[in-house]
A protein has these predicted regions:
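Detector for outer-membrane/organellar transmembrane beta-barrel domains
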Residues: 59-159
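Residue-level signature of outer-membrane beta-barrel architecture
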Residues: 5-7, 33-36, 47, 59-60, ...
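Outer-membrane beta-barrel "beta-signal"
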Residues: 143, 206-222
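Residues that define the transmembrane beta-barrel architecture of outer-membrane proteins
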Residues: 1, 24-28, 35-37, 49-54, ...
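Outer-membrane beta-barrel domain signature
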Residues: 18-21, 42-46, 55, 76-80, ...
Length: 222
């Protein structure tokens, strides 16, 4: 169940309730956001599976840039203790034909040593989608160029695990054919130490396990 409310100028309140079959695993949360002339603010809290979590964030424009900071602090109901936080600090350059974005992510669920990646994969919080990263410290970036005709778009995105080190690059080219049809071609290229399987399976880096691939896609919108 989801309820959205707009109690006043610039305010938005978003509440969600998820019934997972038992009161023990019941999940619910509420988030309030406020748009001000100088910043967008949000804060909230709730229960997610067996954690109680508080969160807050702010984004503010600085010239042609936008600075973002958000974080979440979980409390484990079973261990009766706080877990490490999850924090993201980012900067975006918007406007014109070029868009740039970069961010640092502190992943409290992640490991500081590749030897512990298997443990992260077995963590229920990873299985529940609370994080998609195995490492503790990560960098992400994106650069996009769209010429004035808006029919062509070139994008390069990347992720970097600062501890392995390992990473990925994702170049993409999109052409707007017209008539609500788009054609895209791109690749996913990873680098880092590859896993070993003998005598025991072991991950030596995060993104080195991903492999590489090339893709093409035709999208039609109705």
């Amino acid at each position: 169940v989801r309820v959205l409310s707009y109690p006043g100028d610039g305010w938005e309140v978003d509440a969600v309730l998820a019934d997972r079959g038992s009161s023990r695993n019941l999940s619910a949360g509420i988030r309030a956001s406020k748009s001000l002339p100088w910043a967008d603010l949000h804060m909230g809290g709730g229960k997610f599976w067996r954690e109680v979590m508080g969160l807050a964030g702010v984004s503010t424009p600085v010239g042609n840039y936008k600075i973002r900071l958000e974080g979440a602090l979980p409390y484990d109901l079973d261990a009766e203790d706080f877990r490490l936080p999850r924090i993201t600090l980012g900067v975006d350059r918007l406007g014109g034909e070029t868009m740039l974005s970069a961010e640092y992510n502190f992943n409290g669920i992640g490991a500081t040593d590749a030897e512990d990646y298997i443990r992260v994969l077995q963590d229920p919080r990873f299985a529940q989608g609370e994080t998609y990263f195995l490492g503790r410290h990560n960098l992400g970036g994106l650069a996009s160029w769209t010429p004035g005709n808006d029919r062509i778009s070139l994008t390069v995105s990347g992720l970097l695990n600062l501890q392995d080190p390992s990473g990925t690059l994702g170049p993409n080219f999109t052409y707007d054919i017209g008539q609500s049809t788009r054609f895209s071609v791109g690749a996913f290229v990873s680098f880092g130490d590859k896993p070993v399987f003998e005598p025991d399976p072991r991950l030596k880096s995060e993104f080195g396990t991903y492999g590489d691939f090339v893709y093409s896609m035709l999208s039609v919108y109705f």
